Structures are given as structure tokens and as C-alpha cells.
Swiss-Prot record:
Paired cysteines (S-S): 2-13, 30-119, 96-111
Chief localisation class: secreted
Keyword Secreted tagged: yes
Taxonomic source organism: Macrovipera lebetinus (Levantine viper)
Protein name: Snaclec B6
Family statement drawn from the similarity comment of this UniProt entry: Belongs to the snaclec family.
Cell compartments where the protein resides: Secreted
PROSITE patterns cross-referenced by the UniProt entry: C_TYPE_LECTIN_2
Tissue: Expressed by the venom gland.
Length: 125
């Protein structure tokens, strides 16, 4: 089971943090919150819908960091947890990524700005 203050969805635990951090600081924070924790990886429209329902009522904010980043600055985007990037929802927009909490769109943002974020980890066994 997920910790009491995290939400469960399809084998993962999620928590919205009403803190503003840079992408790096948010990712580090997520790794400290739960074993195997990272910024959220959105792999399907169902997972995006779940994140929107979870995040928007808490944050009333438009954008959250997600775990997608251009790690090698070569325009090759990859999920922080190394999952395959099969599902995509890009708008046309620098090296880190945010998702809108009001609809299904992703944007690139400079990694050093502060945003709210959602952490994700596997359900502990």
C-alpha cells in the first residue's frame, strides 16, 4: 500500500507537493520522499487524467514539473525513471518539462525556474 498521504493508481503512488522548486531540486526531493521516488512519468491519457484530478484541486495552478528532461542537451527526451517514451503530448515550445493541470498538454521550460510538482513511486511490496 501507498503511504497514507499518497494516492494510489495502477501500481504507483503519487503525491502532489504545494512547494515551488527547480526541476533538479524537485527531482531530488522526490527521491527523498519515497523509495524509488521520482518526478511523475505520464505514460498514458489515463495517467494524465488521474494527475489532473489529483493536482488541480490541491494546487489551483496551471503547471507542474514532470520527470521528462533532455539529459544530454541533444533534444533526446527521456523519462527520469528510464521508461520508454511511447506516449507524447507536446505543444510547440528549453530542457525540462511541465504538464498543464487543466488539460493534456506538455511544455518545455528552463530547468532553473520554480514550479509545483508531483512525485511518483512504485507501490511498496
Amino acid at each position: 500500500d501507498c503511504p497514507w498521504d499518497w494516492s494510489s493508481h495502477e501500481g504507483h503512488c503519487y503525491k502532489v507537493f504545494k512547494l515551488r522548486k527547480t526541476w533538479e531540486d524537485a527531482e531530488k526531493f522526490c527521491t527523498e520522499q519515497a523509495r524509488g521516488g521520482h518526478l511523475i512519468s505520464l505514460k498514458s491519457t489515463e495517467e494524465v487524467d488521474f494527475m489532473i484530478k489529483l493536482a488541480y484541486p490541491i494546487l489551483k495552478a496551471n503547471l507542474v514539473w514532470i520527470g521528462l528532461r533532455d539529459f544530454w542537451r541533444d533534444c533526446h527526451m527521456g523519462w527520469r525513471d528510464h521508461a520508454n517514451l511511447l506516449y507524447k503530448a507536446w505543444s510547440d515550445e528549453p530542457n525540462c518539462s511541465v504538464a498543464k493541470t487543466t488539460d493534456n498538454q506538455w511544455f518545455r521550460r528552463k530547468c532553473n525556474i520554480s514550479q509545483y510538482f508531483v512525485c511518483q513511486s512504485r507501490v511498496p511490496r
